Amino acid sequence: MNLHEYQAKSLFAEYGLPVSEGFACDTAQEAVEAAGHIGGNLWVVKCQVHAGGRGKAGGVKVTGNKDEIRAFAENWLGKNLVTYQTDAKGQPVAKILVESCTDIANELYLGAVVDRSTRRVVFMASTEGGVDIETVAEHTPELIHTAIIDPLTGPQAFQARDLGFKLGLNPTQMKQFTKIFMGLANMFNDHDFALLEINPLVITTEGNLHCLDGKIGIDGNALFRQPKIKAMHDPSQDDAREAHAAKFELNYVALDGNVGCMVNGAGLAMGTMDIVNLHGGKPANFLDVGGGATKERVAEAFKIILSDSNVKAVLVNIFGGIVRCDMIAEGIIGAVKEVGVKVPVVVRLEGTNAELGREVLAKSGLDIIAATSLTDAAEQVVKAAEGK
């Protein structure tokens, strides 16, 4: 689960981090009133969506004119913002963040992630702020400095000072950076973050550190113990099919291809997508039906896959372990009849009662292609998607 920038900054403020005065507005009139409440003669207005690249897409504007604030809000509220991080449809804009403008002397980067290799929270800092950290990591990795947080001792001030020295901060800024670092580390732990970024963390013309942006990703598995964070969820930013799938405990991720994939097990699902790609196809989705591949769940999975008009064929790849393949086959048949599938369906069954499952499919009288292996399944579904 991701948070909006205004939500992230609200958390920053709770932990004493320096952020701009700002208001998240639902209407153009609120945006104009927010500028008046903030005061000054220069403001920043930002579309609130779960995606980066807003500035390049026209979703951020610096202005000293309240009429321009009104026009910006009227233009974007209720519309979709398309950036390089969204799909072609973009993300809906339901709120506009109006903030005081900050004079910038320099831009830094500060972020943290859960590193699987060390099984620790790792902080990253760089003098290359304001650009994608992935780009920095690819071209100038030596400019990224790290600090690994030991879960037994927690964040330490000396780690902040070490990063601060590498960023070239002066003594005053070092104290500010240490406070920011410690606050973020505690926040990361308290609220079960999976990702945290301040990009950029700026040095103002007065020489002070300031959190100009905020990006937070939450560990979805921990939401049961984070009711406050869970209440911040904005369902409008979710893919409609992914949200529907979650109601049935189906793990679904929409992609751009034309081969629908229905698989039990995340690892097998990724392997299935790989082999479809290997044979010249493009997966339309990742869909893991999990261990309980019942008729009802399979039917919902078909409905979700076929709600994508780009899908030209469906590959069902099931390994029967605890669940028997003959039962899965009956579920597939029932689902195909219920949903009224109009595209070719290729089914590969392996595991417990796999042969019996294939017999059940063959006797169904439905236009279901039974594959003998995963390679055969991939070849057949790619041909079917191409109309061959």
From Swiss-Prot:
EC number annotated for this UniProt entry: 6.2.1.5
Record's catalysed reaction(s): succinate + ATP + CoA = succinyl-CoA + ADP + phosphate; GTP + succinate + CoA = succinyl-CoA + GDP + phosphate
Cofactors named for this entry: Mg(2+)
Domain of life the protein comes from: Bacteria
Chain positions recorded as substrate binding sites: 264, 321-323
PROSITE patterns: ATP_GRASP, SUCCINYL_COA_LIG_3
Gene Ontology terms, MF aspect: ATP binding; magnesium ion binding; succinate-CoA ligase (ADP-forming) activity; succinate-CoA ligase (GDP-forming) activity
GO CC list: cytosol; succinate-CoA ligase complex
Binding site residues for ATP: 46, 53-55, 99, 102, 107
Pfam families, per the entry: ATP-grasp_2, Ligase_CoA
InterPro entries assigned: ATP-grasp, ATP-grasp_succ-CoA_synth-type, ATP_grasp_subdomain_1, Succ-CoA_synthase_bsu_CS, SUCC_ACL_C, Succ_CoA_ligase-like_bsu, Succinyl-CoA_synth-like
Associated pathway: Carbohydrate metabolism; tricarboxylic acid cycle; succinate from succinyl-CoA (ligase route): step 1/1
Domain called ATP-grasp: residue spans: 9-244
Similarity section: Belongs to the succinate/malate CoA ligase beta subunit family.
Quaternary structure, from the entry: Heterotetramer of two alpha and two beta subunits.
Name of the featured protein: Succinate--CoA ligase [ADP-forming] subunit beta
The organism of origin for this protein: Shewanella frigidimarina (strain NCIMB 400)
